[in-house]
Amino acid sequence: MARYVVCWMFTINNPTTLPVMRDEIKYMVYQVERGQEGTRHVQGYVEMKRRSSLKQMRGFFPGAHLEKRKGSQEEARSYCMKEDTRIEGPFEFGSFKLSCNDNLFDVIQDMRETHKRPLEYLYDCPNTFDRSKDTLYRVQAEMNKTKAMNSWRTSFSAWTSEVENIMAQPCHRRIIWVYGPNGGEGKTTYAKHLMKTRNAFYSPGGKSLDICRLYNYEDIVIFDIPRCKEDYLNYGLLEEFKNGIIQSGKYEPVLKIVEYVEVIVMANFLPKEGIFSEDRIKLVSC
């Protein structure tokens, strides 16, 4: 039996008193029954507000035989309301509310339908939360990402059409450099559009090892470089991506090899002279 449980089944043989509602209980149902051997007993199902230990439950239900609920909520409730063995009852306390089954698939489906946070399953689905909370938080992050991306709006201009036309003709050497010196030309907005509609990786720059680690074989790599990072842009990393061989030595050595990557730089500045050969950069002015 799990050490701490929310949902319990209980049986009290030859009861002298009947269970009463407590502040710790969210929902309870029971009835007085007569078993096959004629023993008078209380058969009940209880959902606690918090996970409780067997010791705690014995304090709440003295003399009861207690077990963790094994079936569904509805099955447990119905079992305590069956007519063929009933003497008195059934008696219900609190509000019965169906929650999703305590397994990863159903919890993820419920998250998608209700938009609940993972923490909200701590008590209703404790086993899934304990075993798979990291997965639930990743699902939540992906849901939040999808929601944010669906809210993005795109406005196109002449230069975005030029970029699309360039990408329509793959070239293993070419790096597309989108130059807009004033800001507000829509470079980041277009980067968002590519992330939303294409298999695109986005980076505002940073340490090369971190960028290599985050890259997950996307078809398009976008470097949206803010003005303050002009002096820190790693031009060699751009060539690594364009060459299709990206290496990271962070945590453990990683070598990523891809057939073709479209590299796009969005910047308020031009590339430094002498860094690239003339055929390497395709300049697009905003």
Curated annotation (Swiss-Prot):
Protein name stated in the entry: Master replication protein
Keyword terms of this UniProt record: ATP-binding, Covalent protein-DNA linkage, DNA replication, DNA-binding, Endonuclease, Helicase, Host nucleus, Hydrolase, Metal-binding, Multifunctional enzyme, Nuclease, Nucleotide-binding, Nucleotidyltransferase, Transferase
Family the UniProt entry places it in: Belongs to the nanoviridea/circoviridae replication-associated protein family.
Residues forming the catalytic site: 79 (for dna cleavage activity)
Comment text on domains: There are 3 rolling circle replication (RCR) motifs. RCR-2 is probably involved in metal coordination. RCR-3 is required for phosphodiester bond cleavage for initiation of RCR.
Binding positions (ATP): 180-188
Motif window: RCR-3: 79-82
Cofactor(s) in the UniProt record: Mg(2+); Mn(2+)
Catalytic activity line of the entry: ATP + H2O = ADP + phosphate + H(+)
GO terms (BP aspect): DNA replication; rolling circle single-stranded viral DNA replication
Span of the annotated motif RCR-2: 41-43
CDD domains the UniProt entry points to: SIMIBI
Keyword Metal-binding: yes
Taxonomic lineage from the root: Viruses, Monodnaviria, Shotokuvirae, Cressdnaviricota, Arfiviricetes
Domain spans labelled CRESS-DNA virus Rep endonuclease: 2-96
Pfam families, alphabetized: RNA_helicase, Viral_Rep
Bound cofactor: record note: Divalent metal cations, possibly Mg(2+) or Mn(2+).
A GO cellular component annotation in the UniProt record: host cell nucleus
Known partners and oligomeric status: Homooligomer (Potential). Rep binds to repeated DNA motifs (iterons).
Motif (Nuclear localization signal): 50-70, 96-102
Main localization of the protein described in the UniProt heading: host cell
EC identifiers of the protein: 2.7.7.-, 3.1.21.-, 3.6.1.-
Chain span(s) of sequence motif RCR-1: 9-12
UniProt cross-references to InterPro entries, sorted A to Z: CRESS_DNA_REP (IPR049912), Helicase_SF3_ssDNA/RNA_vir (IPR000605)
Role summary: Essential for the replication of all genomic viral ssDNA (trans-replication). The closed circular ssDNA genome is first converted to a superhelical dsDNA. Rep binds a specific hairpin at the genome origin of replication. Introduces an endonucleolytic nick within the conserved sequence 5'-A[GT]TATTAC-3' in the intergenic region of the genome, thereby initiating the rolling circle replication (RCR). Following cleavage, binds covalently to the 5'-phosphate of DNA as a tyrosyl ester. The cleavage gives rise to a free 3'-OH that serves as a primer for the cellular DNA polymerase.
Residues that bind a divalent metal cation: 33, 41, 84
GO molecular function: ATP binding; ATP hydrolysis activity; DNA binding; endonuclease activity; metal ion binding; nucleotidyltransferase activity; RNA binding; RNA helicase activity
